[in-house]
């Protein structure tokens, strides 16, 4: 099965910064990425080798 998630956050105003990270199951999406990244994981069984 193909599952896709898309997160959207409001644009920042001058001087503001994001101070939070997003997480879903064993996938952590941190706020330090400056480009689009494709994350793939079938989530079954848990394989820590896929973790960032």
UniProtKB/Swiss-Prot annotation:
Coiled coil segments of this chain: none
Enzyme Commission number, as recorded: 3.4.21.-
Post-translational modifications: N-glycosylated and to a lesser extent also O-glycosylated.
Compartments where found: Secreted, Extracellular space, Extracellular matrix
One Gene Ontology molecular-function label: metal ion binding
Swiss-Prot/TrEMBL keywords: Calcium, Cell adhesion, Developmental protein, Extracellular matrix, Hydrolase, Metal-binding, Protease, Secreted, Serine protease, Zinc
Protease listed as a keyword: yes
Main location: secreted
Main EC class the enzyme belongs to: hydrolase
The keyword Lipid metabolism is assigned to this record: no
One GO CC annotation: extracellular space
Family under the similarity heading: Belongs to the reelin family.
Domain notes: The basic C-terminal region is essential for secretion.
Function according to Swiss-Prot or TrEMBL: Extracellular matrix serine protease secreted by pioneer neurons that plays a role in layering of neurons in the cerebral cortex and cerebellum by coordinating cell positioning during neurodevelopment. Regulates microtubule function in neurons and neuronal migration. Binding to the extracellular domains of lipoprotein receptors VLDLR and LRP8/APOER2 induces tyrosine phosphorylation of DAB1 and modulation of TAU phosphorylation. Affects migration of sympathetic preganglionic neurons in the spinal cord, where it seems to act as a barrier to neuronal migration.
Quaternary context: Oligomer of disulfide-linked homodimers.
Protein name: Reelin
Organism annotation: Bos taurus (Bovine)
Lineage: Eukaryota, Metazoa, Chordata, Craniata, Vertebrata
